[in-house]
UniProtKB/Swiss-Prot annotation:
Site (described: Important for catalytic activity): 232
Highest taxon, organism lineage: Bacteria
Cofactor detail note: Binds 1 zinc ion per subunit.
Alphabetical UniProt keywords: Hydrolase, Metal-binding, Nucleotide metabolism, Zinc
Entry coiled-coil feature ranges: none
Active site: 212 (proton donor)
CDD domains: ADA (cd01320)
Family to which the UniProt record says this protein belongs: Belongs to the metallo-dependent hydrolases superfamily. Adenosine and AMP deaminases family. Adenosine deaminase subfamily.
Gene3D superfamilies: Metal-dependent hydrolases (3.20.20.140)
Protein name: Adenosine deaminase
Chain sites annotated for binding substrate: 27, 29, 182
Length: 349
């Protein structure tokens, strides 16, 4: 006979799985299912271990990971698998399918086109392929899935500008906005400020990785540059004046709990800034960052917030509202998504 605590745990897990969710911070190359990784490897003639346990050692973060750079090394294995349009379309479809399976209503999937240009694809061809996969997923599942284009902070500024310019000018593309990822420690916002301003002049919305490497100054610099969505912001912990500035400027936080504990951006739950941001009234969203690399999904993340912080269903509803309002969807799409979210959570006026 199942004990009452175990029964309650199963009920809660099922409840969280069935909750309608949204996600703003999900990396394509870090979120491929094992099944799709195997399919892509076969297409690329790359040998893989037969067992999933051995494959996991190649594509999930090692337990002894100490830094963000250690964590990022895991992506090197996936890069050769994403060098054709067919592979990119399959990958995009796979990630959106995973999200839809746990009732994600809206997702923004981000990736760096330059990482899929090793075999001759142009930046525009890369984005076209990803969009094709997401369009198929939207037809097959009840999900809205959009593309975010990442620049790699450590790459040539000229290369990033050229890629962004080409993509922005391509009338065939429907991508939602821009982001900057990669080596934050050596390339803080001030170092790439001209690149950020260039991107802002393209008249597309943008988000930005900041505060993932223990540097609260990077969050302050990002806010000063006028960026209204920031990924991670982990280093804001124990900086009340910065939190106040964050709230005053109406910036939205893309929190990634599991990932931050793995990269040691937060060395413990006590250093993860959720509670401080929550109490200050900050705009919070919950995200996976990398489903496969971090061995997580949104249901697992929600469970952690319940277990660690006592997060309520009302909180989850509010965080999903935040995500839709801060999303790079159109105003018409936002209104429709908010109405669907409200209905799903049984909210009334």
């Amino acid at each position: 006979m199942i004990d009452s605590n175990r029964k309650w745990s199963l009920i809660m897990k099922n409840t969280l799985h069935n909750l309608v969710k949204t996600e703003l911070h999900c990396h394509l190359d870090g979120s491929l299912s094992f099944e799709t990784i195997r399919e892509l490897a076969e297409m690329a003639n790359i040998a893989l271990p037969e067992s999933d346990s051995e494959l996991a050692k190649l594509v999930t973060v090692p337990e002894d990971s100490e830094t963000l750079l250690d964590y990022l090394k895991t992506f090197d294995f996936i890069r050769p698998l994403l060098q054709t349009q067919k592979a990119l379309s399959l990958a995009a479809y796979d990630v959106a399918k995973q999200a839809a399976a746990e009732h994600v209503l809206y997702i923004e999937i981000r990736f760096a086109p330059e990482l899929s240009m090793d075999k001759g694809l142009s930046a525009v061809q890369v984005v076209e392929a990803v969009e094709k996969g997401l369009q198929k997923a939207q037809r097959d599942f009840n999900i809205v899935a959009k593309v975010l284009i990442c620049g790699m902070r450590q790459s040539s500024k000229q290369l990033t500008k050229e890629i962004f310019r080409q993509i922005n000018q391509a009338k065939s593309l429907e991508f939602a906005g821009f982001d900057f990822a990669g080596n934050e420690h050596d390339f803080p916002p001030q170092e790439i400020a001209d690149l950020i301003r260039f991107t802002q002049r393209l008249d597309r919305p943008m988000t930005f990785h900041a505060g993932e490497c223990g540097c609260p100054s990077h969050i302050a610099q990002s806010i000063a540059l006028g960026i209204k969505r920031l990924g991670h912001v982990t280093a804001i912990h124990d900086h009340p004046e910065l939190i106040a500035d964050f709230v005053e400027n109406k910036v939205t936080a893309e929190l990634c709990l599991t990932s931050n504990l793995q990269t040691k951006a937060a060395k413990s739950l006590a250093e993860f800034p959720y509670q401080e941001l929550y109490e200050a009234g900050a705009k919070i969203t919950i995200n996976t960052d990398n489903r496969t690399v971090s061995n997580t999904n949104l249901t697992k993340e929600y469970q952690l917030f319940v277990d660690y912080f006592g997060t309520s269903l009302a909180d989850f509803y509010h965080f999903n509202q935040n995500a839709i309002e801060a999303s790079f969807a159109s105003e018409a799409e936002k209104a429709e998504l908010l109405a669907e979210l409200k209905k799903a959570y049984g909210q009334t006026d």
